[in-house]
Design a protein with these regions (language model features):
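Conserved ABC transporter NBD signature motif
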Residues: 60-68, 75-76
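Catalytic Walker B motif of ABC-type/P-loop ATPase nucleotide-binding domains
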Residues: 153-156
Length: 252
């Protein structure tokens, strides 16, 4: 059985009198893709930022690869990958220059051009982030997050704002990263995204985890409670039609 790489115990976050995260607990195994699902305001991002050491923990503990995040935040940041927003990158540097900069900051040995090839951006090596499309920016931010060969890769709403083609292209990229054995923790409010990418999901609402299991087991439990779909289930969706008509090749 794979070892636990991330253990979250009774995690809480308060902003004044408002309790955004209310006693969240879960564990993630090495090589697992773990998804945190929930509507806006459920506490997903606050939970992720506390785990990453980017936000103070009000109560509870987070242990990542044997390190207590509250006590060793600097050490934790060296072994994780965090997907940055496009605005976080130096605007006047090219993609390959940015990756070299991040590599040197980490003291890593990664090859910037190989990282760009991994995310299908090698032809954009000399471009600046501002010249990229939305899908390309998201893929580059993942390349930057992989520069230190992280123990855990964190993706916060990685496909928000992308069209169906770019979203599915990013899913393909995450699946490629997953196939290499990288542990991934992601947040999303796209149910299909979680179903495609995640080994297990935790469903959050109002700061609490209200259910946690594999996508298949969660669906089986719902059916076991007598659930009847409100509409006929068909083998294709309108999104499938859109992608079929507009092209399945990589488009940004």
């Amino acid at each position: 059985m794979a070892e636990t790489v991330l253990a979250v115990q009774d995690l809480k976050k308060s902003y004044g009198d408002f309790q955004a995260v209310r006693g969240v607990s879960f564990a993630v195994k090495h090589g697992e893709v773990f998804g945190i699902l929930g509507p806006n305001g459920a506490g997903k991002t606050s939970t992720l930022e506390m785990i990453e050491g980017l936000r103070d923990i009000t109560e509870g503990t987070v242990v990542l690869n044997g390190l207590n995040v509250a006590k060793s935040a600097a050490a934790v940041k060296k072994i994780i990958g965090v997907q940055l927003q496009a605005s976080a990158f130096f605007p006047n540097l090219s993609l390959v220059e940015l990756l070299r900069l991040f590599r040197d900051l980490y003291g890593a040995e990664s090859d910037p051009m190989e990282l760009l090839r991994e995310v299908s951006l090698e032809e954009k090596a000399s471009a600046q982030v501002k010249e990229l499309s939305g899908g390309q920016k998201q893929r580059f931010s993942i390349a930057a997050a992989l520069v230190n060969d992280p123990v855990v890769l964190f993706l916060d709403e990685p496909t928000t704002g992308l069209d169906p083609q770019a979203r599915r292209n990013l899913w393909d990229l995450v699946q490629q990263i997953r196939a290499k054995g990288t542990t991934i923790v992601l947040t999303t409010h796209y149910m299909e995204e979680a179903e495609v990418l995640c080994h297990r999901v935790a469903i959050m609402d109002e700061g609490k985890i209200i259910s946690m299991d594999t996508p298949d087991n969660l669906k089986k439990a719902l059916i076991g409670r007598g659930f009847k779909p409100h509409r006929q289930v068909v083998p294709a969706t309108l999104e499938d039609v859109f992608i079929d008509l507009t092209g399945k090749e990589l488009r940004d």
